[in-house]
């Protein structure tokens, strides 16, 4: 079932401007291309709110199903980068949610008796 993974984070206040720029380059140039290779990953995009690329950052990953997240964690390329991805986050403010796409199939499954 098509799933949207949403991760909302703020970067740590202790990061310098240079570290923030390097982190964004890492996400764009290294992490996203590797995550996109995991079967079932449809898209991975990053969005920033009004926090100047430091706060109110949202990662949106469109996946074939919620199991793709577990495949990310099991994938050697992605798992090798997880610590670096998380290292810049203020984990006190980080949140994540999974959302199912409302499809005719989902409606039929939920309405059948």
Residue ranges and their predicted role:
Residues 15-22, 68-72:
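Short, conserved charged micro-motifs
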Residues 47-54:
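A short beta-turn/loop motif at secondary-structure boundaries
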Residues 12-14, 51, 64-66:
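Short coil/turn motifs at secondary-structure junctions
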Residues 1, 111-113:
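Basic/polar N-terminal segments that are highly enriched at the extreme N-terminus
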Residues 2-11:
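Active-site-flanking beta-strand signature of metal-NTP-handling nucleotidyl enzymes
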Residues 56-58:
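Histidine-centered divalent-metal-coordination microenvironment in nucleic-acid enzymes
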């Amino acid at each position: 079932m098509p799933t949207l993974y949403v991760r909302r984070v703020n970067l740590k206040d202790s990061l310098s401007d240079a570290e923030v720029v390097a982190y964004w380059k890492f996400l764009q140039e290294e992490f996203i291309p590797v995550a996109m290779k995991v079967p079932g990953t449809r898209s991975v995009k990053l969005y920033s709110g009004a926090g100047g690329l430091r706060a109110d950052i949202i990662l949106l990953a469109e996946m074939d199903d919620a199991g793709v997240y577990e495949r990310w964690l099991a994938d050697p390329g992605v798992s090798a980068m997880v610590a670096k991805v998380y290292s810049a986050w203020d984990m006190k403010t980080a949140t994540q949610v999974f959302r199912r796409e409302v499809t005719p199939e989902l409606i039929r499954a939920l309405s059948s008796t």
